[in-house]
């Protein structure tokens, strides 16, 4: 679902930690959606999916105590296929798309700074959107995908649980870097 490494994700969590300790979610909205079924699924093959996230943050310097996290999502649902199902000249991507969906959720967060604290930086807000904000919106994204696939006359799709890497104990070495879902 993403190409960030565990180390990158942990670094973002650290940068956004001050905001994560003070922010509360106040409202969630589906801002836009577009979905299409491109071909019928092959029941004998089963389906697989790819979900990409693009987090962003909107913050108005005049409104110091609130910001909006937007998560744009691109979902591709494909037939599971063996390599021999791909015809010469075709790519797997061209032969497998059953449905696609593009949609965007937004969440309004507010926060309260302690006396004497600096306002959140753009880096903190962006890190928060990519970590805690994404985590906060994921259950809504997950439920929406389940509902959407049923409405498109596809088997309801239950997305995997969104996971975070485990923090490393002080003095311990980082495990081998790998991509995370």
UniProtKB/Swiss-Prot annotation:
It comes from the Bacteria. Keywords: Chaperone. Gene3D superfamilies: SecB-like. Transmembrane segments: none annotated. The keyword Nucleotide-binding does not apply. InterPro entries: SecB-like_sf. Induction: Operon autorepressed by HigA1. Signal peptide: none annotated. Disulfide bonds: none annotated. Chaperone component of an atypical, type II toxin-antitoxin chaperone (TAC) module, probably required for antitoxin HigA1 to neutralize its cognate toxin HigB1. Homotetramer, interacts with antitoxin HigA1. Belongs to the SecB-like family. This is SecB-like chaperone MT2006. The gene is secBL.
